[in-house]
């Protein structure tokens, strides 16, 4: 960001505090974990969060961090979140080895010492303390240096000051300087896709969207399964946790240095690649292969994970995670339906719970497509072949699901959250379930609305919801 823009943002913020960041290492395995301080950072920009909602009351996330006044123990700020470690610890690899991942905690810069408290959900979904750290904002080791310039911030949608809007930052990764115009076009296309669906369509007045393209020395990002390695500015790469389509940026320090140059509550990373892929972690970032035919869909789907902690509603695709103990998920769009008389969300009157649908036929078809997909990847087939398969799958599944007796009704449809049995979603089809041309389901929209409220306050609606 150019110096005049930095100054303008600082002046516009008035007394808004700067953004303070605690960088930490998160180490462990499937059964144990610990956190350790890396460094304290005072970021260059004011804190973008809503000053009227500093304490998180949404009960989302596998983890929760709190910032408390050291002298009085008064709660000053909190946020629920998920993390790379929190996902990795559920993989088979975590049963065999220890690994360390880097993560950050951002909050309004305090004017006196505070206590950072990190909590994690236990088996009953209650948050239990796992780490504390005393933070003195006047410590001589607080890093106040300016990050290396990452380019000029592009204003895609400006609806108001950062502290009164939900601020989405779109970062490019793997774009050379000559390709940054391509990135900008892709970022605008992705934004259009987001604003075409509810609740974002009717709440565009509650959003700011900015983009930033740090120039890469080489075009593209890493894809280890094909022998491709790139030292890209944000460090995004395919094959996370051994899943060929899962794209993560594991160099959190590098990611934060780039992102700190624009106001953000949430971040989407567009990777310069054509191969289908992406990822989304609540409160961390979303990723998408911007050159893929399916980029608009993946962008919206992964932001569902990132912004509102929405669970995947599908149950037939291969994932790296191992099944866990059956407890009610904290995610708002899935349930184990422990009490059918009291479902997790409002149900369409007259809809039976559980809600019948032809799951067996769907599952047979879906698994057939999965086998074809694996075969294409195994022989490194062209992406056009994968696109054709996905288009065929979309046609078949759209026709099937739209013809279900309870299509477009809110109920409890079995099959969700990677589980074919015992887990339920609110509608038969949804952006979090398939690549079909459908909206977010009712449960997803409600969760997303609540998060937008948290950052932007009362809704500024520009069109009616569905």
Where are these regions (language model features)?
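Short pre-active-site segment immediately N-terminal to the catalytic Zn-binding motif
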Residues: 180-183, 278-303
């Amino acid at each position: 960001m150019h110096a005049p823009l930095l100054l303008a943002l600082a002046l516009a913020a008035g007394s808004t505090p700067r953004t303070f960041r605690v960088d930490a290492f998160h180490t462990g395995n499937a059964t144990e974990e610990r956190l350790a301080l890396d460094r304290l950072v005072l970021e260059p920009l004011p804190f973008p969060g809503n000053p009227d909602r500093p304490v998180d009351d949404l009960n989302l996330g596998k983890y929760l961090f709190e910032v408390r006044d050291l002298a009085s123990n008064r709660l000053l700020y909190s946020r629920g979140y998920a993390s790379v470690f929190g996902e990795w610890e559920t993989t088979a690899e975590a049963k065999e080895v220890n690994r360390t991942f880097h993560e950050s905690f951002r909050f309004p810069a305090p004017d006196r010492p505070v206590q950072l408290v990190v909590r994690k959900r236990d088996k009953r979904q209650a948050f239990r303390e796992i780490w504390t750290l005393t933070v003195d904002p006047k410590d001589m080791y607080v890093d106040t240096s300016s990050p290396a310039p990452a380019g000029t911030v592009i204003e895609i949608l400006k609806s108001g000051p950062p502290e009164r809007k939900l601020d989405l930052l779109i970062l490019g990764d793997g774009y050379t300087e000559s390709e940054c115009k391509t990135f900008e076009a892709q970022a605008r296309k992705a934004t259009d896709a987001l604003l075409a669906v509810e609740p974002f369509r009717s709440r565009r007045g509650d959003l700011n969207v900015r983009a930033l393209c740090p120039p890469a020395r080489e075009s593209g990002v890493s894809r280890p399964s094909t022998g491709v390695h790139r030292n890209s500015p944000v460090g995004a790469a395919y094959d996370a946790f051994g899943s060929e389509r899962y794209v993560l940026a594991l160099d959190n320090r590098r990611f934060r240095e780039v992102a700190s140059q624009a106001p953000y509550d949430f971040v989407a990373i567009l990777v310069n690649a054509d191969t289908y892929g992406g990822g989304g972690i609540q409160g961390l970032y979303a990723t998408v292969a911007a050159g893929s035919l399916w980029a608009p869909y993946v962008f919206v789907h992964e932001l569902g994970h990132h912004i509102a902690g929405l669970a995947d509603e599908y149950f037939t695709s291969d994932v790296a995670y191992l099944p866990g103990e059956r407890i009610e998920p904290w995610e708002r769009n899935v349930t184990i339906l422990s009490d059918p008389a009291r479902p997790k969300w409002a149900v369409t009157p007259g809809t039976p719970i559980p809600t019948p649908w032809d799951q067996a036929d769907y599952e047979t078809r879906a698994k057939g497509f999965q086998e074809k997909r694996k075969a294409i990847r195994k022989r490194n087939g062209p992406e056009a072949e994968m696109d054709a398969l996905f288009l065929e799958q979309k046609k078949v599944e759209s026709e099937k699901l739209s013809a279900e007796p309870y299509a477009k009704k809110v109920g409890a449809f079995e099959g969700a959250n990677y589980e074919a049995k015992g887990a339920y979603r609110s509608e038969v089809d949804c952006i979090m379930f398939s690549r079909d041309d459908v909206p977010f389901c009712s449960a997803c929209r409600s969760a997303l609305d609540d998060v937008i409220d948290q950052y932007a306050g009362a809704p500024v609606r520009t069109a009616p919801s569905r």
